[in-house]
Regions:
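An alpha-beta-alpha
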Residues: 108-152, 248
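Short beta-strand segments enriched in small/hydrophobic residues
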Residues: 1-11, 94-95, 121-132
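Amphipathic helical "hinge" segments at domain boundaries
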Residues: 1-44
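Hydrophobic alpha-helical
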Residues: 44, 56-75, 157-221
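Hydrophobic alpha-helical segments within soluble ligand-binding/sensing domains
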Residues: 96-123, 171-172, 220, 236-252
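Flexible loop/hinge segments that line or gate small-molecule binding clefts
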Residues: 66-103, 217-229
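Flexible loop/turn connectors
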Residues: 203-252
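Short, surface-exposed alpha-helical segments at coil->helix boundaries
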Residues: 8-16, 43, 102, 106, ...
Length: 252
């Protein structure tokens, strides 16, 4: 499941375009959606995919262990699959479409480091998930981010701010409490496309906060233009979605 302004909406636009172009070849894409903040909803799809009688699968790699389980089952059934969003090792995927998560986090570390002093405290904002603490891609991005700072001998403190996927009022209270307690923090990062939610919060508060986010979606671009987001790291999800369907078609 996704909101219409998110990375996944853009990715589906690319999938739709590829399906339309391959219509004359009798290519049909069946979408099976899950809650990206609830691992159990992904797990519930696995038996449905096994029974779907499909010739190929595109897997969004939100939950590492569940993706490995599904990939293993598809290997047994001899059904080819493509991974999208984050690469998972020890799978036999036909192809992977997405950015190098570690490298993008490393770049994000450089972008933020250039805006702060080496002892300045910063924040990492996260949206809480059910069933698995972090998605594979986010973990790799954060690893790259932290490693860059470590290489630069960054000596500040990195705070973790846990937010809730569908509770905006609760999030405002969490952010208010955090900033009240840590008035010195005015720089941070979020490793997904929801940077605009934070950008809007800081804009409405009149706070000058140096924020880095991911994905060039319209609300994020608005925040980038008004200065409530300082940098965005782009993935071009519509191209990823298009290419994964085309690649699976060529393989078959």
């Amino acid at each position: 499941s996704f909101a219409k302004v998110e990375y996944w909406d853009k990715l589906c636009e690319g999938i739709d375009k590829a399906e339309q172009e391959l219509f004359s070849y009798n290519v049909e894409v069946e979408r099976m959606c899950f809650n990206q903040y609830d691992k159990s909803s992904f797990d519930e799809l696995i038996p449905r995919i096994e029974e779907a009688n499909c010739q190929g699968v595109v897997i969004a790699t939100q939950f590492h262990d569940s993706v490995v389980k599904l990939a293993s089952r598809l290997d047994q059934l001899q059904i080819p699959y493509i991974l999208i969003d984050a690469f998972i090792e020890n799978t036999n995927c036909v192809a992977y479409y997405g950015t190098n998560s570690y490298d993008s986090g490393y770049i994000a570390g450089r972008l933020l480091y250039e805006q702060i002093n080496p002892t300045e405290n910063i924040a990492i904002f996260r949206f809480i998930r059910k069933g698995e603490m972090q998605v594979t891609q986010v973990m790799k991005r954060e690893e790259g981010f932290r490693n860059y700072l470590a290489e630069k001998n960054y000596d500040g403190r990195i705070y973790s701010v846990q937010l809730h996927a569908d509770e905006p009022e609760k999030n405002i209270n969490i952010l208010n409490a955090f900033l009240e307690e840590h008035k010195e923090v005015n720089a941070g990062i979020i490793f997904n496309s929801r940077a605009h939610l934070l950008g809007k919060y800081f804009r409405d508060k009149g706070e000058r906060f140096r924020l880095i986010g991911y994905d060039v979606i319209d609300p994020n671009i608005t925040c980038l233009n008004d200065g409530s987001i300082t940098h965005l790291i782009a993935q071009r999800p519509e191209v990823q979605g298009f290419n994964c369907i085309r690649a699976l078609f060529r393989h078959l």
